[in-house]
A protein has these predicted regions:
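Structured, acidic catalytic/metal-binding patches in enzyme active sites
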Residues: 1-220
Length: 221
């Protein structure tokens, strides 16, 4: 199967090449979801990886320490927030629709609940976290024994996503539920993924104009 995928692999997203002080580097636009047939990058991306001595990721999600830290935001002093009953019921409805384990989901921070149902909903568009470019890049670097580094830390990501005023967080969940209930969430996901896959930089740069995720002051913070 891997050989078939590798033979049919095409370059997707955007790959920049830069040079400084006689050294060459590459910048690649990765994404957190993917399709099985996209799992292996195309020849130009593979060549860039092979020519690189180090692979620097947003966050190395195959690192066991990172995985442990991401699984427990409380270790960073981030407190969980209970959803008001109306929002909780709406979340449960969405969770059942995307086949999420309702009881387990309810124990997560509300933002993680929203992220989880969004990722699970993407499966209906044949998109999976397990086929994301970050997982391939990290696995490739490990297999090739290249240096791996992260630009961010688990704590930074957790604080960026989850820390904040409870009112703002609940407003974010409200906006997310509205997108799901209107049927627009999947449309937006597919539009973003297609823009990434085709390397449509103009569409990606206009993301905030069409994502319907910047409608409130909280969204724009």
């Amino acid at each position: 199967k891997i050989q078939v995928l590798a033979k049919a692999a095409k370059d997707r997203s955007i790959l920049w090449k830069f040079e400084k002080s006689g050294r060459t580097g590459y910048l690649y636009g990765s994404i957190h979801l993917g399709k099985q047939e996209w799992m292996i990058p195309g020849p130009k991306t593979i060549a860039a990886l092979q020519a690189s001595g180090a692979v620097v990721l947003e966050l190395d999600i195959l690192d066991p320490q990172v995985q442990a830290q991401m699984s427990d935001p409380s270790r960073f002093g981030i407190k969980n927030i209970a959803l008001p009953q109306p929002l909780k019921q709406r979340m449960e409805t969405i969770a059942k629709r995307v086949c999420a384990p309702v009881a387990a989901l309810a124990g997560l921070h509300p933002v993680m609940q929203l992220i989880t149902v969004t990722m699970l909903d993407a499966r209906f568009s044949n998109l999976e976290v397990g086929y994301s470019t970050e997982i391939f890049l990290s696995g490739f670097a490990r297999g090739a024994k290249k240096t791996i580094a992260s630009l961010e830390t688990a704590e930074l990501q957790m604080r960026t996503l989850l820390a904040g005023d409870a009112k703002d967080i609940l407003e974010t969940i409200e906006s997310g539920m509205t997108l799901f209930e209107s049927g627009k969430q999947r449309v937006q996901t597919e539009r973003l993924i297609n823009a990434w896959a085709t390397g449509n930089l103009e569409e990606l740069q206009r993301y905030e104009q069409w994502c319907e995720c910047m409608n409130t002051e909280t969204d724009r913070k």
